Amino acid sequence: MDEDSLNQFLSINQILRKKVYSIQMPEAIILDLDSTLLNAYGKQEGRAFNFHYQSNGYHPLVCYDGITGDLIKIQLRDGTQYSSTGVVDFLQPILDEYLEDFPEIKLLLRGDSGFATPGLYKQCEENGTGYVIRLKENAILRDKASYLVDELDEITEYNQLKVLNAF
């Protein structure tokens, strides 16, 4: 599928979305961002080795409705692209569509650690979109959350003493 065909497909998808929403408007949409490997064999243009997946193929960027599973947008990318490469440009037309055509729908963006980029956070905040991004554990996060671990330890110890004293 070439870029023109994909754009036509996405336009049809947008028209269908408007028709569906005219019948039943959702209260909220979870914009579920993801990237995945599409295995490819031979010498297709854009086919490349992806180190994360340890395989050859394409690495498309995808946005689904996290509630219904409906495809909102897909962008074919070569296999070498990192998960978040181009995500701000990919997402803005989606945000524009929802903010202009469906301003009453609450938007929440969800992504894994591959989308933990300040540009995406800023974009969501500037467009009034909530976001939840899973972060990989690291020393900085452990340090920032250490007080919670200490509090949990204290609560657990207190509860154990309460149980022991109850007998």
Write out the residue ranges for each language-model feature:
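An anionic, glycine-rich sequence signature occurring as long contiguous blocks
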Residues: 133-167
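Short acidic, glycine/serine/threonine-rich loops at helix termini
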Residues: 41-46, 72-76, 86, 118-124, ...
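Short, conserved catalytic/metal-binding motifs centered on acidic residues
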Residues: 1, 27-37, 69, 107-116, ...
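Electropositive, glycine- and tryptophan-enriched low-complexity nucleic-acid-binding patches
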Residues: 51-102
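Domain-level cores of phosphate- or acyl-group-handling catalytic modules
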Residues: 82-140
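Short, structured patches in soluble enzyme cores that scaffold and shape functional sites
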Residues: 35, 65, 73-78, 113, ...
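Short, well-ordered loop/turn elements at secondary-structure boundaries
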Residues: 24-27, 57, 66-67, 103, ...
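Active-site-proximal, Lys/Arg-enriched surface segment
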Residues: 1-62
